[in-house]
């Protein structure tokens, strides 16, 4: 019998939000969802906790004062019960996953990580590079490393400048 997942995959009025870390949702289900829903109905998102982007290791205070382990795949698990407690995955890492793990092109990854989430949130002046849109832009190198961040047309981060 069909279940809720099957309904979600075929219902065109629904947009699916996925954390593409391989922990929250199995990679095969991510790929199945991408193929069934298409780029306009899948948004790559994160439920990152304080300390997002932290390297693997054990930390105190990242999540509700609990001791947690950031795993190599950027999942966050509580110690000692090993419960999944969020992610240390950034939105940039979602973009990198779209390209590297799921084989999507740069424009497709931008749709998954920017255009579709902005549409879902009703942010009609964001999510794409076009005239009249907010100039919120990240610049990446060929290896998809962050080189520059521009918010509302102002450079707020440059990888080649010392950070305060």
Feature locations, PLM:
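His/Asp/Glu-enriched, well-ordered alpha-helical/loop segment
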Residues: 3-22, 29-46, 50-133, 137-140
């Amino acid at each position: 019998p069909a279940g809720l997942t099957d309904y979600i995959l075929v219902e065109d009025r629904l947009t699916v939000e996925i954390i593409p870390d391989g922990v929250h949702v199995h990679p095969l289900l991510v790929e199945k969802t991408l193929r069934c829903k298409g780029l306009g109905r899948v948004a790559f998102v994160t439920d990152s906790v304080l300390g997002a982007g932290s390297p693997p290791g054990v930390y105190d205070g990242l999540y509700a004062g609990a001791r947690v382990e950031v795993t190599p795949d950027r999942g966050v698990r509580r110690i000692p019960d090993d419960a999944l407690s969020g992610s240390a995955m950034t939105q940039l890492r979602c973009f990198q996953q779209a390209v590297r793990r799921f084989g999507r092109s740069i424009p497709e990854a931008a749709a998954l990580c920017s255009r579709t989430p902005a549409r879902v949130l009703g942010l009609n002046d964001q999510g794409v590079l076009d005239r009249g849109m907010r100039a919120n832009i990240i610049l990446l190198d060929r290896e998809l490393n962050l080189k520059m961040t521009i918010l509302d047309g102002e450079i707020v981060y440059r990888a080649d400048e010392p950070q305060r």
